[in-house]
Every structure is written in structure tokens, then in C-alpha cells.
Amino acid sequence: MSTTTYRSICGEESLPYIDCDRCIRALYARLQHYVQQDRGDCPICAYFREKIGSRDGSESDARLLLHAQVNVVYELFARHADQEALALLERIEDDCC
């Protein structure tokens, strides 16, 4: 009986993994940027201000927030037409979740 693994499908090519922690920190920083730039007219930013609250922004906080709120994060980046952040979010969903 053989086991199917990623390596058995891809062969010996280098694995296309990303540095999940670094990418999550970058995406969290982008989220914080939009929240900080908000002048009070973005309900999504207000939502995240409440969710972030007094959290310290540690990796575990960032990871939990992004995983739990992925659809709302997507909506925020889509509203700002931030294609780079949207692509990174998709990559994090695929490779890190």
C-alpha cells in the first residue's frame, strides 16, 4: 500500500511553500494600516478596531485574527482595491490554513 504525499505528486521539484509567519505578519500590518488610516467612515475598520482591541499584535494574535476573520479581511482589501494584499491573503489561505 502506498501513501500519497505532496512529494509523490510533485516529484523532486522544490516545494512551493511560503513563509507563513512572515506573510501573516505582513498581511496583519497591512490590515492595521487601513484601520489606522480610517477617519471613522469605514464600518469594517471599526469592526477590526474592536476585534484588535488591546491585543499586542503577536504572531498568534495576528494568525488567529486572520484565520477567524478571513472573509472580512478579504472585504477590507477588496474595498481598497489592494490586489497585492488580496493575492497574499489567497496564498496564506491555500498554504497556511
Curated annotation (Swiss-Prot):
Q: Per the UniProt entry, what is one GO biological process?
A: nitrogen fixation
Q: Where is the signal peptide?
A: none
Instruction: Tell me the superkingdom of the source.
Output: Bacteria
Disulfide cross-links: none
Q: Where are the transmembrane segments?
A: none
| Keywords tagged on the record | Nitrogen fixation
Its function, per the record, reads: Is required to sustain N(2)-dependent growth in the presence of low levels of carbon monoxide (CO). Probably acts by protecting the N(2) fixation ability of the nitrogenase complex, which is inactivated in the presence of CO.
Protein name, per record: N(2)-fixation sustaining protein CowN
